[in-house]
A protein has these predicted regions:
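Active-site mouth of glycoside hydrolases
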Residues: 29-244, 249
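Substrate-binding cleft of secreted/luminal carbohydrate-active enzymes
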Residues: 298, 312-347
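Alpha-helical scaffolding within the catalytic cores
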Residues: 58-62, 170-176, 232-243, 275-284, ...
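Glycoside hydrolase catalytic-domain groove-lining segments
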Residues: 222-228, 233-303
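Aromatic-rich peripheral "rim/lid" segments of glycoside hydrolase catalytic domains that contact
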Residues: 335-390
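A conserved amphipathic helix/loop scaffold
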Residues: 443-660
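A short, well-structured beta->alpha microelement
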Residues: 413-431
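Bacterial Sec-dependent signal peptides at the C-terminal "C-region" and cleavage site
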Residues: 10, 14-28
């Protein structure tokens, strides 16, 4: 008996050790500094019905064409309703006495169709022969606004129904076990936007992710698990917050379609808001979730929304920006146009029919040629990996209210001003920095008192803190911490016109949903309205500095269309640039007054700095620049010691060599 107990204990320990061995998120296709391009894949002949309308000849030819044009990674989907075709004997009241498989006895305890698994393996074999790695979306029960679940679950919420979850778990274990030996598979994915499959509380969604994630890892502890979700929130109380996904997934992802994300899609596809949206959203996920992130789905929603030329130009900027920010990769939605398909969702909306990189005749679209050209350029470089970018500031976003809009606005203003930020959630410990930007409040509950204290303590310890103030902002001891007194607050909307003393003649106008009138007491006024009201102030607090901008320029950057593109923009970025100077931020490549060009700096091991400059405008620009060092090698673009000349939507990549 004693020996038997020891054997059981040893076996249990080995099982737990196997389950506890987490795969590294910085290996394989997700290696730091690397970058993959590819697509989400549904065979062109049948789209989501590719498994039931199986054409191996189409799969083989199409994947070969994708590989020929530079695709190295595909995200693929075993459609749940096809791979686990559960039917059943239904009793009165809708309960099932027993489950069947296509109205026949189950062929295995998981109810999985083995023929579908064989078809999936064939696709994996084709991918491997073509050098393509696969991310497999396991529970694919939601696709393009439509449910694809086994018929027995069509009237159930599959995220909370115990029976549905039991069968999902069985499917995941069976499928992963059957295919985990295949070398083409790089990662498992929970499924396609599973947070859209039903309404849940946060606890219910946590439990679903934990159950499915555990089933994956118990069966295959060697591969990372990708979130696969869409539209996560900064809010602590949200149904699917970023932090929860960071806890339960190894890799995070974004699906930054400009028309489907709040505050986006307000200008052309090849302008700053749209081009930096994937970068900003992915960095927000990575910084708050604490896991690497990549752009898992991106697209132009077809020629009914964007021309092919604008799409290719915008995608060029998006890819270079994502690579510069170590976002691992970018997958287009999807592989081929599907205008020939005659079932929903392809018959419901034009947006679903022309999303491909390839046309139906296998000819590549400009966006595919651009993605291939990007990969060819990367391979031509003398270095394989881009060193991590340098960051100069921390954008603090609220976690008691929605933080995406002000966070995105602050990020865009920072890039316009000439520095590179990262994100942090207000309700957790803040990363160390000499410069913090606290986003404007949506209401008086946006920031807890401990969150406010943490930010002001950073200033007391020596940092520069910029508070973007709004009518809904409420701060305790503002007089003691910022040298400002609140005169009154009201619900009356206001439009302020003001200018920064350091930039005379550069007037700007900013609205707010309410009015908060501040009186400057012990602080220095750096900008004021035409009526003399302080808008931008500086106050010495402890060893540091507190700056207050009494106008929600972060939110208005997103609300307006005259801030980011065009020859005459609202110069809100001037306030961020002044804050950057006060914070003592020094850049190796300091750009002049050119808000349409973004620079990232990548310190190399030899002491030099690799600089990437991206022109986010669809017009040629000459960007003034001051280099702290000598101009070294130039790998892309027209770069001089004092300026960078950039064609429309183009990038420069060059080296600055230290001379001191």
């Amino acid at each position: 008996m004693a020996m038997k107990r020891i054997a059981i204990l040893v076996a249990s320990a080995l099982m737990l050790a196997s389950f506890g061995a987490q795969p590294s998120a910085e290996e394989g296709i997700f290696t730091q500094g690397e970058f993959f391009v590819g697509c989400n894949y549904w065979a062109k002949n049948a789209g989501m019905y590719m498994w039931s309308q199986w054409r191996p000849d189409v799969v083989e030819k199409e994947i070969g064409e994708l590989a020929k044009h530079g695709v190295t990674v595909m995200r693929v989907f075993p459609l749940w309703s096809d791979f686990q075709p559960l039917t059943g004997v239904c009793a009165a009241g809708g309960s099932y006495k027993r489950f069947l498989q296509n109205n026949r006895p189950l062929s295995n305890p998981a109810g999985v169709d083995d023929e579908m698994v064989r078809r999936f393996r064939f696709m994996c074999d084709v991918a491997e022969r073509n050098g393509i790695k696969l991310i497999v979306g396991l529970v694919t029960g939601w696709m393009s606004g439509r449910q694809f679940v086994p018929v027995v679950f069509e009237e159930k919420n599959v995220l909370i129904d115990a029976e549905a979850i039991m069968w999902q778990t069985r499917f995941v274990k069976y499928f992963v076990s059957a295919l985990k030996d295949h070398k083409a598979i790089a990662a498992w994915d929970y499924g396609n936007e599973c947070n859209c499959m039903g309404r849940t509380s946060q606890a219910q969604f946590y439990n679903w992710m934990d159950i499915i994630g555990s089933a994956i890892r118990l069966t295959d502890p060697t591969r990372p698990v990708v979130s696969g979700m869409h539209g996560l929130s900064t809010e602590e109380s949200a149904r699917a917050p970023i932090r929860l996904n960071g806890e339960l997934a190894d890799i995070l992802c974004t699906h930054p379609y400009s028309f489907y994300v709040s505050g986006c899609g307000k200008e052309a596809f090849n302008t700053m808001r749209t081009e930096l949206h994937p970068t900003a959203e992915s960095l927000l996920y990575a910084d708050l979730g604490g896991k690497p992130c990549f752009v898992e789905e991106i697209g132009n929603l077809g020629t009914s929304c964007n021309s092919e030329s604008r799409t290719a130009a915008g995608m060029r900027c998006t890819m270079f920006s994502a690579w510069a920010n170590d976002l691992k990769g970018c997958l287009w939605w999807c592989n081929s146009d599907q205008e020939v398909l005659d079932f929903p969702p392809y018959t419901d909306t034009a947006n679903e029919r022309e999303l491909g990189m390839l046309r139906q005749d296998y000819s590549p679209k400009p966006v595919m040629l651009e993605m291939h050209a990007f990969q060819k350029f990367r391979k031509s470089l003398p270095f394989r990996k881009l060193p991590p970018r340098r960051t100069d500031a921390v954008i603090v976003v609220p976690e008691r209210s929605a933080g995406w809009i002000p966070g995105f606005g602050a990020y865009l203003l920072a890039r316009q001003a000439g520095f590179d930020p990262r994100f942090a959630g207000a309700e957790m410990e803040l990363p160390e920095s000499g410069f913090y930007i606290m986003c404007s409040s949506e209401n008086n509950m946006s920031y807890s008192y401990p969150a406010q204290k943490r930010v002001f303590e950073k200033a007391r310890a020596g940092a520069t803190v910029l508070i973007v103030y709004a009518a809904g902002s409420r701060f305790t001891a503002l007089r003691q911490q910022a040298g400002l007194e609140v005169d009154y607050s009201s619900r009356s909307p206001i439009e302020r016109t003001f200018e920064l003393f350091a930039s005379p003649g550069r007037k700007m106008s900013c609205g707010d949903s309410g009015t908060c009138r501040l009186i400057a007491r012990e602080c220095e006024v750096l900008a004021k309205t035409t009526a003399g009201e302080p808008v931008f102030t500086r106050f010495k607090y402890g060893k540091g500095t507190v700056l207050v901008c009494n106008s929600p320029i972060d939110r208005q950057t997103i609300a307006r269309t005259d801030v980011l593109t065009g020859t005459q923009v609202q110069p809100y970025y001037l306030l961020f640039r002044e804050a950057m100077k006060i914070a003592g931020v020094k850049r190796v490549a300091a750009k002049g007054d050119c808000p349409w060009v973004g620079l990232t700096e990548h310190p190399a091991a030899d002491g030099s700095t690799i600089v990437m400059a991206i022109n986010f405008e669809p017009r040629a620009l000459s960007c003034p620049v001051a280099l702290d060092g000598r101009l070294g090698r130039v790998w892309r673009g027209e770069v001089k010691a004092d300026r960078i000349d950039l064609p429309p939507n183009e990038c420069a990549l060059f080296e600055v060599v230290r001379t001191k």
